[in-house]
Amino acid sequence: MKRPPDFNRVAQIYAPMEKLTFGPWLWRCRCCFIQELKTQRIGLVLGDGDGRFTAKLLEENPLVLVDAVDASVEMLNKLRLNAGLRSARVRVHLADARAWVPEGSAYDLIATHFFLDCLATAEVAELARKIRARTSADAVWVVSEFTIPDNWFGWLVAGPLVRALYLAFFVLTGLRVQRLPKYREAMAEAGWARIKEQRLLAGLLVGELWRAQ
């Protein structure tokens, strides 16, 4: 297993960098289905960066308890800060999600926002199987990702942009993955079914809601 990228280097500038490059769009993508996550009680959030989504989830769902997993101590510190007093409902785990063993057995909410694109397809498949074994029968998984549409926009704009982003994060964090994984196929094979989808920025961004089968 390759060493995880070092996001400690960008923790302090993560949110400003995001707003500078994509404005509000990544945030809107993360929150596509936030209103449908109000009945879940035990959540697992992987690689949430500075934790703004986790903070929003805690605000919208006053009963949910969250396990937050990240390989960056600085990102976890930002998550606690953004969650404020609600951080009492969060257990943070400083770990590589690929190797971390879930402690619960009845997660009914999984969230990965712009995280699966840091993994290879085989790693997504293994992670999805591992998580499915630790979720409830009615669990949902909310996903936000970059995509490359199979059209002129994908060929001329989205594709080059995604490649540039991978190069930038290789320089900034040491991220070794350099292409988007086939996460949909991997999740489907692991027992997850996509039930909703919302595309933004001409298909460059996609928010998805999946349910355990």
Go through each PLM region and give its residues:
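Class I SAM-dependent methyltransferase SAM/SAH-binding core
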Residues: 44-45, 49-99
